[in-house]
């Protein structure tokens, strides 16, 4: 009997000593505007948070149709995971999914596909160009965050920012949604880079 207890204790000690150290930060995918069919339109990045906080996928619906996804770093409010909640407009609402390991909020589709499956009109649009992505972040006035893009002057004219018509929201409405998600304790907005 004592030998059996000793074996169990030694086994437990062996497992405890053999565990890998837990990282102090978690890395998540970051995308502010993802079409469910074609992937991240707004430029894909990554974000880091404390290891006690989750990676998030926030799905924005209009009535029962998925309009877009937001992927990013969540704040430590795990009770909010799997929550459904109405935003600003009676026909828009969100659903939150959380996960607790690096890059667990993976993409729902291949990124930046050149051909779109399904009939035209079912997608938000093609990925934005680098200058459009820069304009997108500037127009949102998010906390001075700019994605890792090659430095160049943002051009006006044919390459200027036009949100995908299938989205059905303005830049101002998107900004309200992102700030709401941040202030409600769901999404951590990236900070300015030095």
From Swiss-Prot:
Cellular component, GO annotation: external side of plasma membrane; extracellular region; protein-containing complex
GO molecular function: identical protein binding
Organism of provenance: Rattus norvegicus
Principal cellular location given in the protein's record: secreted
One Pfam family linked to the record: UPAR_LY6
Mod. after translation: N-glycosylated.
Domain UPAR/Ly6: 26-118
Disulfide bond listed as a keyword: yes
InterPro entries: LY6_UPA_recep-like (IPR016054), LY6G5B (IPR038773)
Compartments, as annotated in UniProt: Secreted
Domain of life: Eukaryota
Disulfide bonds: 28-55, 31-40, 47-73, 81-98, 99-104
Alphabetical keyword list: Disulfide bond, Glycoprotein, Secreted, Signal
Cited CDD domains: TFP_LU_ECD_Ly6G5b
Name of the protein in question: Lymphocyte antigen 6 complex locus protein G5b
Annotated glycan sites: 182
Span of the signal peptide: 1-18
